[in-house]
Amino acid sequence: MESIEQSIIPGLPDDLALRCIAKLSHGYHGVLECVSRGWRDLVRGADYSCYKARNGWSGSWLFVLTERSKNQWVAYDPEADRWHPLPRTRAVQDGWHHSGFACVCVSNCLLVIGGCYAPSVSSFPHQKPVVTKDVMRFDPFKKQWKMVASMRTPRTHFACTSVSGKVYVAGGRNLTHSRGIPSAEVYDPVADRWEELPAMPRPQMDCSGLSYRGCFHVLSDQVGFAEQNSSEVFNPRDMTWSTVEDVWPFSRAMQFAVQVMKNDRVYTIVDWGESLIKTRDTDEGEWYNVGSVPSVVLPNHPRELEAFGYGFAALRNELYVIGGKVLKWEESGAGRFDIVRLPVVRVCNPLDRPLNWRETKPMCIPAGGSIIGCVSLEESSPP
């Protein structure tokens, strides 16, 4: 029997031992819990999570939701090179699918915002989809989901990003605005409160959001076409919108196509024919090629295959290409193929030339295939 008074680490004061264990990232928690019952109770306890939260030791996370995962998110720890499933959220009922939501990290938490709940045909054949304004928050310290303040307007397929510690949303659609929503809102995670912003000059639907140079950019589903290169830009400093003529060369088929890294370095994937990574000259606004995403090689298959439906994320100065699917054609030439869902994760440093890709640990069960949501969280200290 272990004594309650037993030291956390024999030979070390408990406050120093707690600090040592708390500095280990979340990917090691499963191993820590196997050391002893005392360590298991420590890692799962409220004092431990509060201690990490006070010091801002969230660690770095890559959150991913894939198809056929029954709405269960998984997370990657780059320090431990480990994936692990998150607790299930109770907001999504069994037999329903969540899509069209936005996911963003702010104040060391993951927010899953809005979207549409649609039933599977077999489970609820007469039930219509429901557009929601709900917001779920995952606390990486407590490892718990919680409902927080809802948006003022239900919306799906909308623009969302974080700027200076607040979350901005705009556009999208719902049952009463099928051609686009002009309204915008901002969320303060400290006050847990949403506030209305001035409406956009024109409604936007099926749009994406980007934080760039301190402003909230709303990119429409038509970006990438020569005649549709304008975007709506909100400046939080003077609370005004402006329409900017600019060039964003990605395809809307890529849901997570733009990543902004340190020093406003912008990267995108252009998935027309082949998957090219481009970066933007911050002064001139021109785009140029950095390299390509490597093809997929399957065991016992002679040809290299192009993936689709993958996610794209930036974490700790590296770019991640996550999951996706490939079509594995039969060699008989009969035109038949299998759809292979990929758990593979590929990483590169975009400053290396040529790009040097490596594979991390593949995603854990139940993840794999097309990416529905992905976002990264990097540790930041409290003010």
Swiss-Prot record:
The keyword Methyltransferase does not apply. SUPFAM superfamilies: Kelch motif (SSF117281). Keywords: Kelch repeat, Repeat. It comes from the Eukaryota. Kelch repeats lie at residues 50-103, 109-165, 166-214, 216-263, 318-377. InterPro entries: F-box_dom (IPR001810), Kelch-typ_b-propeller (IPR015915), Kelch_1 (IPR006652). This is F-box/kelch-repeat protein At1g16250. It comes from Arabidopsis thaliana.
